[in-house]
């Protein structure tokens, strides 16, 4: 059996010791919730605790907290977010929880991207859900929160001012400029941002829009990027989706893009340098994504995706890596 958090092999169903500590402070929490999924349970139980929708408005998020060693739904002092199987017209939606869990684990375990503790959990009716610990809640016993803003708020773009597609109006270059403007330690944070944008491209997260990047204020008074969130291979659910939610550059495409019709090594090299990252550092970060096929395959195989979706996930990643290593020559 594999741990429902990190995929480590264990002798029982549930979470390994490390994941119990990271997720629940060491409390022995069961990986099966004591109630059915929202589709089989009293809708009022869930409706009062819904947070918001994602995956283009088809996935509900619910607030949870730890009561002793049990996870319970709550409408206040939430410590966790629960995302059950979405409903809608997208493909393979029953695989969405496992997809997000795997993609978040890949980011955290293999690509040096900070992610909050997360896991797969199950309802009593065996339906899976994605569980993630909130990173904005302080561990001070008072359930206070770190001040946080997403980059739509920072850029002051809203549906009222920019229309329904406001989340997709900026470019990644413009988010980088906002990081420079609002975060004093921007040199460090820009490298984190660059790594995350590259990860989203390679693992086909086509919904990494401006609201899926945020900054927060630490106890020390420093502004930093939050841990990454909402990472998943959206192409599994929306095959015709664009490679990226936003363009790399503000108002142009590179010569490499014009020649190839898609982003490649040259685009990300140029993008990193446009952000102000030294070329040697950009090259180093890009190179860290190479040669990890065996490690990626191991996590995909250990994940809770359906077997045929595992094959698709690997195929999509390999295709994107093939594109990524195309070098443009003038």
Predicted segments, located by residue:
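Regulatory N- and C-terminal appendages and interdomain linkers associated
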Residues: 1-42, 46-48, 223-225, 294-330
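Conserved ATP-binding subdomain of kinase catalytic cores across diverse folds
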Residues: 41-163
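A residue-level signal for conserved active-site and pocket-lining positions in enzyme catalytic cores
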Residues: 64, 107, 151, 207, ...
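Conserved kinase catalytic-core segment
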Residues: 95-110, 168-239
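Short linear loop/turn motifs
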Residues: 121-126, 167, 283-292
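ATP-dependent phospho-/nucleotidyl transfer catalytic cores
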Residues: 124, 131-202, 267-270, 274, ...
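Catalytic-core segments of enzymes that bind and process phosphorylated/nucleotide-bearing substrates
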Residues: 150-176, 218-279
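Mobile late-domain/C-terminal helix-loop "cap" segments
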Residues: 257-303, 307, 311-318
């Amino acid at each position: 059996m594999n741990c429902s958090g990190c995929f480590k092999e264990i002798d029982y169903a549930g979470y390994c010791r490390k994941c119990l500590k990271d997720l629940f402070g060491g409390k022995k929490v069961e990986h099966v919730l004591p109630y059915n999924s929202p589709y089989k349970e009293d809708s009022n139980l869930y409706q009062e605790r819904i947070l918001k929708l994602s995956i283009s408005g088809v996935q509900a998020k619910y607030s949870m907290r730890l009561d002793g060693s049990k996870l319970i739904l709550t409408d206040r002092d939430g410590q966790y977010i629960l995302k059950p199987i979405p409903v809608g017209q997208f493909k393979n939606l029953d695989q969405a929880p496992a997809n997000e869990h795997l993609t978040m684990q890949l980011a955290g375990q293999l690509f040096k991207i900070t992610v909050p503790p997360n896991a797969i959990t199950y309802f009593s009716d065996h339906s899976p859900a994605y569980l993630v610990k909130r990173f904005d809640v302080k561990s001070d016993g008072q359930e206070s929160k770190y001040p946080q803003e997403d980059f739509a708020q920072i850029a002051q773009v809203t549906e009222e001012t920019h229309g329904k597609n406001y989340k997709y109006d900026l470019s990644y270059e413009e988010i980088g400029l906002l990081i420079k403007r609002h975060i004093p330690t921007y040199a460090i944070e820009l490298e984190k941002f660059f790594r995350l944008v590259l990860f989203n491209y390679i693992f086909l997260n086509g919904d990494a829009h401006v609201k899926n990047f945020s900054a927060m204020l630490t106890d020390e008074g420093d502004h930093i990027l939050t841990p990454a969130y909402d990472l998943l291979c959206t192409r599994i659910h929306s095959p015709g989706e664009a490679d990226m939610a936003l363009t790399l550059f503000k108002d142009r495409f590179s010569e490499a893009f014009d020649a190839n019709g898609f982003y490649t090594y040259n685009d990300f090299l140029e993008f990193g340098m446009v952000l102000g990252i030294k070329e040697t550092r950009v090259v180093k970060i890009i190179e860290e994504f190479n040669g990890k096929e065996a490690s990626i395959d191991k996590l995909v195989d250990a994940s809770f995706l359906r077997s045929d979706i595992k094959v698709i996930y690997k195929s999509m990643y390999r295709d994107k890596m093939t594109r990524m290593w195309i070098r443009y020559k003038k």
